[in-house]
Amino acid sequence: MDRERFEKGLAKRKAVLSAEHVERSLAQADDFSRPFQELVTEFCWGFAWGDERLDPKTRSMLNLAMIAALNRMHEWELHLKGALRIGITQDEIQAILHQVTVYCGIPVGVECFRIAKR
């Protein structure tokens, strides 16, 4: 593990998803799941989110669209909360969901809107 990339990823992950959520995920990790948590933190958050060529807001919008396209609604809800935390507006969420609905289909759009309304 690249410790510097892990620490950078940990900071990014906490900034988007909340320190409470991340610390709980890491604390609940056991010998079986700890390597996965480390991989997610180092590569998703340290490598991908740590690349400064895209700002966090743009990266978050991309994630919302991609995760919706994959129909991973539990993960989508988590990233929706993160998007709102970093300043993506309700109007921007609505625009993303219109795009998702057109390209991914009505059922995916319906599910995303249902989650977003909560």
Q: What do the PLM-derived regions correspond to, one by one?
A:
Residues 88-92, 96-118:
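C-terminal binding/interaction regions
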Residues 1-57, 85, 110-118:
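Acidic, glycine/proline-rich low-complexity segments that act as flexible tails and inter-domain linkers
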Residues 61-94:
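Mid-chain, well-packed structural core segment of small domains
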Residues 40-44, 61-68, 96-101, 112:
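Short alpha-helical scaffolding segments that buttress acidic/His motifs in well-ordered protein cores
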Residues 32, 46, 68, 86, ...:
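A short structural micro-motif
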Residues 16-19, 73, 87, 103:
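Residues at alpha-helix boundaries and the short loops/turns that link adjacent helices
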